Amino acid sequence: MARLTVEECMGRTNNKFKLVILASQRAHDLNSGASPVVKHKNSKNTIIALTEIANEQLDVHLLFNLAVQRCRKYMEKFINSDDSYVVHKSKDNIDIFQKNATSNFDELGANSLNVENSKFLDGDNFFLTQKE
């Protein structure tokens, strides 16, 4: 059943990786107490999420924006953390991820947390819509 659902979902996005982002955000919402919009019989939340996406019962743009906001909140906590690993690490020994994340966050500033104004993973063909 999951393989069929994934194939059906591919009509809503233009690649599998974007589908994973959408399904994981919806599964996170379901785990947090959101009500499913499809009937299910003891299905796992990942299958419910994929089914909702395949049945076009969710706004994929809104779902993606929620995923971006969740990621940004996590990154903001990481960057502003008082974790001794980050604070006491020598300047010569900063890993590439930390260096890039910190510099990009500082360059973007506070206005970058607004999803509507950002270009985070934005593209002309990010989502394919089926309008026939």
From Swiss-Prot:
The keyword tRNA-binding does not apply. GO terms for cellular component: DNA-directed RNA polymerase complex. It holds the Pfam family RNA_pol_Rpb6. It comes from the Bacteria. One of its GO terms (molecular function) is DNA-directed RNA polymerase activity. One of its GO terms (biological process) is DNA-templated transcription. Keywords: DNA-directed RNA polymerase, Nucleotidyltransferase, Transcription, Transferase. Promotes RNA polymerase assembly. Latches the N- and C-terminal regions of the beta' subunit thereby facilitating its interaction with the beta and alpha subunits. HAMAP family: RNApol_bact_RpoZ. This is DNA-directed RNA polymerase subunit omega. It comes from Ehrlichia ruminantium (strain Welgevonden).
